[in-house]
């Protein structure tokens, strides 16, 4: 409680030293995790406004040094290529709109790095807001899971959460990943009596994502917790202790809930053993066909959802059939399909620059800087996005 009071007091003092414009946006930034609980649209508006506010702040203060960052320049190159491809697509107005809107994501990242999150106490306060949001979302998901289990203990359903779709675990597994990482790193760095609660909190986040049935989000969060456990301080004995607790916890979870375990083991084995005859491959395939048919400029940003039904079967050597979704459920296939070979290469360069910039921050030897490379490295790891 003393730490909480001290953090709030320090943040309050920090806000008083800022202009009303900057202080207002910092408070608005803190509200993000709670807005995310409402629905994704309010969260998307929040993210977009942060980006617009950052541009306005840079203009008012004449602070444009952030444009010199290598990852920002590679992002600009990729965006320029995407805009050109969108402009010459079969539906330029729609595709240009999608391409212009895409820039909100790197703008938000830049705003956090160079403006809103440039203060340690603000980062700690944001993590506290994330913790509140995680507890609330976990309550939603556990309640839904308990209700489903009470109605049919053997049902192999995925949770919908407050969003009504099948990927609510992405909120905890991806958006709240930094919280789990920091909790795990601090737990490893302290004697087990002092760090146990933080370690259990990180483990509970993993457990909640697992019961949603979302395998990729579960794997990503598990990997992030493990990497954070060895990226800050190396304590082999504590890693073994917490690893043993995690193993026991997962074993108990899968034995108590065999339907959850079946989705992660039996169903996964069936799908991966015959991948090229699975719905996952069928959703990726039309993106590959479109990329092969439009190798230079691609079909335009966001055009997969518009053109998928018209994408031909493609070459006979490309096994399987086409199955249309809003996107091909594979990030790198989508890059090649929508922006062509130049966008694909520029996108890879952008991703590499982001990871390298985050990794170089390890030289500062602070908790946050030592862990910063983990989220982009995992998020951009080649993976299906439909599971």
Language-model features and meaning:
Residues 29-33, 107, 121-155, 163-234, ...:
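Alpha-helical transmembrane segments of multi-pass inner-membrane proteins
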Residues 211-212, 229-276, 285-293, 301:
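A membrane-periplasm/extracellular boundary helix in multi-pass inner-membrane enzymes
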Residues 24-32, 326, 356-387:
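Loop-to-helix entry and N-terminal half of a specific, functionally important transmembrane alpha helix
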Residues 271-285, 297-339:
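Long extracytoplasmic/lumenal interhelical loops at the membrane interface
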Residues 94-101, 156-161:
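Non-cytosolic membrane-interface motifs at loop->transmembrane helix junctions
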Residues 149-167, 316-329:
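Active-site-proximal inter-transmembrane loops
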Residues 1-97, 114, 118-124, 128, ...:
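Transmembrane signal-anchor hairpin modules in multi-pass inner-membrane enzymes, especially those
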């Amino acid at each position: 409680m003393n730490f909480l009071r001290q953090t709030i007091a320090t943040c309050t003092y920090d806000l008083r030293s800022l202009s009303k414009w900057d202080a207002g946006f910092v408070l608005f930034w803190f509200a993000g995790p709670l807005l995310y609980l409402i629905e994704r649209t309010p969260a998307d508006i929040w993210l977009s406004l942060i980006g617009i506010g950052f541009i306005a702040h840079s203009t008012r203060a004449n602070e444009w040094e952030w444009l010199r960052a290598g990852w920002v320049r590679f992002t600009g190159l990729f965006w320029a290529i995407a805009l050109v491809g969108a402009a010459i697509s079969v539906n330029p107005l729609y595709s240009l709109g999608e391409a212009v809107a895409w820039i909100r994501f790197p703008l938000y990242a830049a705003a956090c790095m160079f403006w809103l999150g440039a203060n340690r106490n603000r980062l700690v306060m944001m993590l506290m807001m994330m913790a509140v949001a995680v507890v609330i979302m976990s309550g939603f998901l556990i309640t839904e899971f308990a209700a489903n289990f009470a109605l049919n203990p053997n049902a192999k359903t995925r949770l919908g959460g407050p969003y009504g779709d099948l990927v609510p675990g992405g909120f905890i597994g991806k958006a709240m990943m930094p919280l789990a990482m920091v909790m795990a790193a601090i737990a490893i760095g302290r004697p087990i009596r002092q760090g146990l609660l933080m370690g259990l909190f990180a483990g509970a986040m993993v457990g909640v994502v697992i019961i949603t049935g979302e395998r990729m989000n579960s794997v990503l969060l598990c990997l992030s917790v493990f990497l954070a456990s060895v990226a800050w301080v190396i304590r082999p004995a504590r890693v073994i202790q917490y690893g043993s607790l995690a193993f026991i916890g997962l074993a108990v979870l899968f034995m108590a809930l065999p339907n959850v375990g079946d989705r992660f083991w039996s169903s996964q084995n069936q799908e991966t053993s015959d991948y090229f005859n699975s719905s996952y491959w069928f959703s990726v395939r039309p993106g590959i066909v479109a990329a092969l048919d439009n190798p230079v400029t691609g079909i335009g940003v966001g055009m997969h959802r518009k053109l998928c039904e018209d994408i031909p079967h493609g070459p006979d050597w490309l096994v399987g059939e086409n199955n249309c979704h809003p996107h091909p459920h594979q990030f790198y296939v989508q890059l090649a399909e929508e922006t062509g070979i130049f966008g694909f290469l520029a996108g890879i360069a952008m991703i590499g620059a982001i990871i390298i910039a985050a990794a170089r921050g390890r030289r500062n030897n602070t908790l946050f800087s030592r862990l910063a490379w983990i989220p982009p490295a995992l998020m951009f790891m080649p993976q299906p996005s439909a599971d």
